[in-house]
């Protein structure tokens, strides 16, 4: 076949130069809100992209929602103070941290949502994740000051959970898939690096210029942690190999979770701001601030759908102190990328 040559004129090249950056910087916007209602507070929310589900803790129970419609698919009862959910889709098990009383991890079936067992832990069991490469469920206890680790197929009757002392009050965590776990110590303003093989803390890295570290997420490819800090309010970008703080981004008040997807970092804040940060010239900076309802302090990302889900509610007006949620107004705010 004879080849043909095409010459692009200057006006056409200018159009490309204008359109390509606009596409690369496409923004995020609130798409819709699922009005769920019901009783209970809330904490973390976890996405199951493969099955289009959301798991959201409601203090004494955990809701399972359809992530496309907001329809309630199930309700897992029997918790005292539910905090977070981790799932192992391959095994078909889910895990809920219950920080009430003496503490426990509730294990449930991902298909029927039936409770399979309750493994004793320590009080204030809180953040929880599943690392599929390590085949480990990892959780932390703020009051207990420990990192907990166990296999997802743990014996429901006699199973034991490894506990690693952290010398601090952990809030959330991330795992690199090779045996290193990174834990925010909120009271120490540091990240504790835990080696799961030796079951010891091998490093402590300050998060300054950020304040108390609470939210955490990770990009294993770039070896970076994204740490949401309070007082000062910063999204801190930390190198996981050296502990060096590479960037710090100003964020809103009351951050409680962060996320990372497709080159962008996110911080959800209680003051009704979802911060979107991007890397430019080796430094992260604010690319967009999405206005969300007040109280939307935690989040989860569905990378396939390119959506972010944030639980919150309507609040009673107050003159001072933290406002109380209006009964029956619980909702999930859905933010998507244009």
Each model region followed by its residue ranges:
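Predominantly soluble domains enriched in secretory-pathway, periplasmic, or organellar proteins
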Residues: 21-338
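N-terminal secretory signal peptides that target proteins for export/translocation
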Residues: 1-5
